[in-house]
Curated annotation (Swiss-Prot), chain A:
Role, per record: Allows the formation of correctly charged Gln-tRNA(Gln) through the transamidation of misacylated Glu-tRNA(Gln) in the mitochondria. The reaction takes place in the presence of glutamine and ATP through an activated gamma-phospho-Glu-tRNA(Gln). Required for proper protein synthesis within the mitochondrion.
Reactions this protein catalyses: L-glutamyl-tRNA(Gln) + L-glutamine + ATP + H2O = L-glutaminyl-tRNA(Gln) + L-glutamate + ADP + phosphate + H(+)
Protein name as annotated: Glutamyl-tRNA(Gln) amidotransferase subunit F, mitochondrial
Pfam families documented for this protein: GatF
UniProt lineage: Eukaryota, Fungi, Dikarya, Ascomycota, Saccharomycotina
């Protein structure tokens, strides 16, 4: 029922491989089927769900085995996150992380299509294959920069410490403990 | 039907709706009254709008519904706010949300949950999140339109639950300068309204390159998209196999089939389509978005702005922990998960794998659309589709109590709410959730190829 289209990075990155006669090579991936001719075909198609998100993610199933990260690992994560240890319910965080990880660890078993040619940085939603900047071009770019009111760069228009809860003589204040007694 | 409502009327009704549904975090005591001198056909002069409280405004506070930014007032307006003010829009207030946009129920706010106004006489039901207040402000007819933000469905899900239109444009179309970052590779400003003509005008007003936003779609690429536009007749619509789930809200299929019949009668062609990567989207999303959130929220130390602990900057040897303890529970959970995904033990296994699978998803979408993708250089599939139609939610809005209980059992229970919306966020596609029936929280998303926002808007207008 489905036509299939090969994604071809040799001709057009992320695009379709075109053989010049408006026909595409079939290898899997996304597929478009034949046009529905009537509502009965559509009803039939919609009456057959193909998967259950609960089953796929192993939620509410007996097979779900949770392996919580250790208490030490949780404490390390709290430190990395700038969150206090005092008052933190370590066991609760362990269990919660275990459930979150059982959910996202599904990734391990999913094969990447065309792994060799797939670049993780193409996941960014910006133009692919832009021209590379080099040191000279960077310097050239900087040399043309000037103060721009459109960017809010207006001299004297803004007091840097104006939004700080504590400041002194136009400096930000960090308390003494910040520099001492650090682990 | 008039485009603009009376500002006086909105202000009069606001207080009773606010006390019932907890829609706003702050209300503008003197809404703007600016005349648009240009008087173009896109003018929004006199329209009333609300702004989600994670978009900065210099005239009243921006809190992200968090203790961390309580009383914070930005020294500047976000670009989208500036453009609305220039267009003569009255801004009624800032709307409630899940703290920093993290949540799908609209319940994680220091101001308390937003209550769904579609159920005035029943047990309090969720509005959906995170743009919960934005959707409620539109559903209550307090505003002509609302600005929200959509990271994984945060405009579309509450729009569905409030039975209003919710549009997430292509990533990069609307400026994010002044939008407080949650997950920068996904965050998009979105528009909610009851009327497609209003939504379209707002979109055209805001759809501009902004040099202040490094991810703003360039002028060159916008011109390329315009150049790619051709009349496509008949319009080809796809129904995605992977979005066909066993559990759908009661009444969904009847309304869905009725719409499909209407499309056939209008001469549109309908095709089955399979996009296998759609199944992988929730694990991809919940690997990437908390990692980006952990990075973005590391800036809140209390030194330069926002809340600061009055006694200490360090506790247990952890910098800024006394201040950062004021984050809400859901935000803390996502920061911890994000840092786990980013730490050296897990980095290669989780983060990069998720990025590569995201590329697979984008490429699969490219494979089924007729319109080219200017970001990936896909030339478009000449036999491809123009529009996909996808359900917005697999559930009806439940009670706030049930939602909180389910979420406490496992965070995955609330993550599942995003199953129909996250794929388009990961691929940056324009997606508009429209109600299938008036005052009914059942919606359908109309999805186009990257950059093809106008086809999505035209399609919805043609069937409204």
């Amino acid at each position: 029922m489905y036509k299939t289209w090969r994604l071809c990075r040799t001709h057009t990155v992320g695009g379709l491989c075109h053989d010049g006669s408006h026909r595409f090579v079939s290898t899997g991936g996304a597929k478009i089927g034949k046009k529905f001719e009537n509502m009965n075909q559509i009803r039939d198609y919609l009456s057959r769900p193909v998967w259950s998100v609960h089953e796929y993610l192993g939620i509410n199933t007996k097979e779900e085995k949770l392996e919580p990260p250790s208490a030490e690992a949780v404490k390390k994560l709290l430190r990395l996150s700038g969150l206090p240890l005092e008052g933190a319910d370590i066991k609760e965080i362990q269990m919660r992380l275990a459930k979150q990880l059982s959910f996202i660890n599904k990734l391990h078993n999913i094969p990447v299509e065309g792994e060799k040619h797939t670049k993780e940085y193409d996941a960014r939603l910006v133009q692919r294959n832009t021209k590379q900047l080099n040191y000279t071009k960077l310097l050239e770019g900087i040399s043309h920069q000037k103060q721009d009111a459109e960017l809010g760069e207006v001299s004297g228009s803004w007091k840097a410490t104006g939004l700080a809860a504590e400041s002194k003589n136009a400096y930000f204040v960090v308390k003494e403990g910040l520099l001492k007694n650090r682990k | 039907m008039p485009l603009k409502r009376s500002l006086k009327e909105s202000i009069e009704r606001l207080s009773s709706f606010q006390s019932k549904y907890n829609i706003f975090t702050s209300i503008n005591p003197s809404p703007y009254s600016i005349t648009n001198k240009k008087g173009t056909k896109e003018t929004l002069t006199g329209c009333v709008a609300s702004i989600k409280d994670n978009i900065v405004t210099k005239d009243f506070p921006t809190t992200c519904a968090s203790h961390i930014l309580e009383n914070f007032k930005s020294p500047f307006d976000a670009t989208v706010v500036k453009l609305l003010k220039q267009a003569g829009v009255h801004i009624l207030g800032k709307t409630n949300l899940d703290e920093f946009g993290m949540g799908s129920g609209g319940v994680h706010s220091i101001r308390g949950p937003v209550i769904n106004p579609l159920y005035p006489h029943e047990d309090k039901k969720i509005m959906g999140g995170s743009s919960s207040g934005a959707a409620a402000s539109v559903a209550c007819d307090l505003v002509d339109f609302a600005l929200g933000t959509d990271t994984g469905g945060s405009v579309r899900l509450p729009a569905c639950y409030g039975s209003v239109l919710g549009f997430k444009p292509s990533y990069g179309r609307l400026s994010r300068f002044g939008v407080i970052a949650y997950s920068q590779s996904l965050d998009t400003v979105g528009i909610l309204s009851k009327k497609i003509n209003v939504l379209r005008k707002v979109f055209h007003t805001l759809d501009k390159y902004d040099m202040k936003d490094p991810t703003s779609l360039s002028v060159e690429l916008r011109e390329l998209i315009e150049g790619n536009k051709k009349v496509r007749r008949p319009l080809k619509v796809g129904i995605v196999k992977e979005f066909s789930h066993e559990s759908m809200p009661i009444g969904f299929h009847r309304l869905y089939l009725s719409l499909l019949e209407k499309l056939i009668n209008l001469g549109l062609e309908i095709y089955p389509v399979s996009i296998p990567s759609v199944k992988n989207c929730l694990p991809i999303y919940y690997t990437l978005s908390p990692a980006e959130a952990a990075s973005n929220l590391s800036r809140y130390d209390g030194i330069r702005y926002g809340y600061r602990d009055s006694e200490l900057d360090i506790k247990d040897g952890i910098l800024f922990a006394p201040t950062r303890s004021k984050f809400g529970t859901e935000v803390k959970n996502r920061i911890i998960l994000g840092n786990y995904n980013l730490c050296s033990d897990a980095f290669k296994n989780n983060f990069i794998k998720a990025e590569k699978l995201r590329v697979n998803l984008i490429d699969e979408f490219d494979g089924i659309f007729r319109f080219p993708n200017v970001l990936t250089n896909s030339k478009g599939n000449p036999d491809g589709l123009d529009i996909l139609i996808v359900p917005t939610s697999s559930k009806l809005p439940g009670s706030i109590r049930d939602f909180e209980e389910e979420e406490a059992k496992s965070p995955a229970n609330s993550y599942i709410n995003d199953v129909f919306t996250v794929p388009m966020s990961l691929a940056g596609l324009p997606s508009l959730s429209m109600p299938l029936k008036e005052k009914t929280p059942i919606g359908l998303q109309v999805v186009g190829q990257y950059g093809d926002d106008s086809t999505v808007l035209d399609f919805v207008e043609s069937i409204s």
